[in-house]
């Protein structure tokens, strides 16, 4: 009963950790102080829950959690979270904190969902199934963000066409101005990219603990990483090259088309993505 409660505690920690990484990503890209504060407080909750788990573990076992790889991963994740909190307070180095927490998230996910000798086969199978559910849910949420971003880009190009042709009318009045459409498409991609990244991390962990062979060259796996790279490049051209407007809208539309090809076509060719 207590072991089940601890497993639920770790699963809740992963969800909160994912939200923290999302807000750190927003702060990293946009220097958003509110997002940074939210990320910090969510990470503080993660640290508290991890500390509770470590204290319980040491109380039950009477030893420090470093005697095997799985235990050491959790302690490693706790150290990374602790360092992230210290860095955030003292130095405010967004780049380092974000990527440190991506690593920490991976470590705690591996610890939580990897079967151990103390767990029954049924309980281990339940954890793996729950990992798969979280992986799929996060992927779908990222797809939802990308879909809305695509809609805003299409509306941008439609509005751009109306203005260029000087076709004034009710359609022009009902659609938001170009700058807002462009900004909303960007914001939704800022949300979608880290969610897809975390989903892929969880998917790789699920494949590692549940499949005999890790299908790195599976069509859907490769396609998903290509989608992540394309949307990451979209953020790159927005932030580094400062390309906005029509160019960004066209690139965003191309990214979404690749996303749809990956979901429907490559998903049907996948060796194990039967849920697609």
Swiss-Prot record:
<dbReference type="InterPro" id="IPR045062">
    <property type="entry name" value="Cyt_c_biogenesis_CcsA/CcmC"/>
</dbReference>
<dbReference type="GO" id="GO:0006779">
    <property type="term" value="P:porphyrin-containing compound biosynthetic process"/>
</dbReference>
<dbReference type="InterPro" id="IPR002541">
    <property type="entry name" value="Cyt_c_assembly"/>
</dbReference>
<comment type="function">
    <text>Required for HemL synthesis.</text>
</comment>
<keyword id="KW-0627">Porphyrin biosynthesis</keyword>
<feature type="transmembrane region" description="Helical">
    <location>
        <begin position="66"/>
        <end position="86"/>
    </location>
</feature>
<dbReference type="Pfam" id="PF01578">
    <property type="entry name" value="Cytochrom_C_asm"/>
</dbReference>
<keyword id="KW-1133">Transmembrane helix</keyword>
<dbReference type="GO" id="GO:0020037">
    <property type="term" value="F:heme binding"/>
</dbReference>
<feature type="transmembrane region" description="Helical">
    <location>
        <begin position="217"/>
        <end position="237"/>
    </location>
</feature>
<feature type="transmembrane region" description="Helical">
    <location>
        <begin position="9"/>
        <end position="29"/>
    </location>
</feature>
<keyword id="KW-1003">Cell membrane</keyword>
<feature type="transmembrane region" description="Helical">
    <location>
        <begin position="40"/>
        <end position="60"/>
    </location>
</feature>
<comment type="similarity">
    <text>To M.leprae U1620K.</text>
</comment>
<dbReference type="GO" id="GO:0005886">
    <property type="term" value="C:plasma membrane"/>
</dbReference>
<keyword id="KW-0812">Transmembrane</keyword>
<feature type="transmembrane region" description="Helical">
    <location>
        <begin position="247"/>
        <end position="267"/>
    </location>
</feature>
<protein>
    <recommendedName>
        <fullName>Protein HemX</fullName>
    </recommendedName>
</protein>
<feature type="transmembrane region" description="Helical">
    <location>
        <begin position="132"/>
        <end position="152"/>
    </location>
</feature>
<feature type="transmembrane region" description="Helical">
    <location>
        <begin position="187"/>
        <end position="207"/>
    </location>
</feature>
<feature type="transmembrane region" description="Helical">
    <location>
        <begin position="93"/>
        <end position="113"/>
    </location>
</feature>
<keyword id="KW-0472">Membrane</keyword>
<dbReference type="GO" id="GO:0017004">
    <property type="term" value="P:cytochrome complex assembly"/>
</dbReference>
């Amino acid at each position: 009963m207590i072991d089940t409660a601890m497993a639920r505690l770790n699963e809740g920690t992963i969800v909160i950790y994912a939200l923290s990484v999302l807000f750190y990503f927003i702060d990293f890209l946009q220097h958003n102080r509110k997002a940074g504060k939210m990320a910090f407080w969510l990470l503080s909750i993660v640290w508290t829950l991890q500390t509770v788990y470590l204290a319980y573990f040491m109380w039950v076992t009477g030893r420090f959690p470093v005697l095997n790889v799985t235990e050491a991963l959790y302690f490693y994740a706790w150290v990374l979270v602790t360092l992230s909190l210290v860095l955030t307070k003292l130095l405010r180095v967004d780049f380092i904190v974000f990527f440190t927490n991506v690593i920490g998230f991976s470590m705690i996910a591996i610890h939580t969902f990897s079967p151990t000798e103390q767990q029954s086969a049924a309980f281990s199978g339940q954890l793996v199934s729950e990992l798969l559910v979280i992986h799929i849910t996060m992927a779908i949420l990222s797809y939802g963000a990308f879909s809305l971003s695509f809609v805003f880009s299409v509306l941008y190009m439609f509005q751009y066409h109306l203005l260029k042709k000087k076709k004034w009318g009710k359609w022009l009045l009902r659609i938001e101005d170009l700058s807002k459409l462009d900004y909303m498409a960007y914001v939704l991609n800022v949300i979608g990219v880290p969610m897809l990244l975390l989903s892929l991390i969880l998917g790789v962990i699920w494949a590692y603990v549940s499949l005999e062979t890790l299908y790195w060259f599976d069509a859907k796996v490769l396609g998903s990483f290509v989608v992540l790279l394309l949307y990451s490049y979209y953020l790159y051209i927005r932030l580094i090259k400062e390309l906005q407007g029509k160019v960004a809208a066209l690139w965003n539309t191309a990214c979404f088309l690749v996303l749809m090809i990956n979901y429907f076509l490559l998903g049907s060719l996948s060796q194990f993505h039967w849920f697609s």
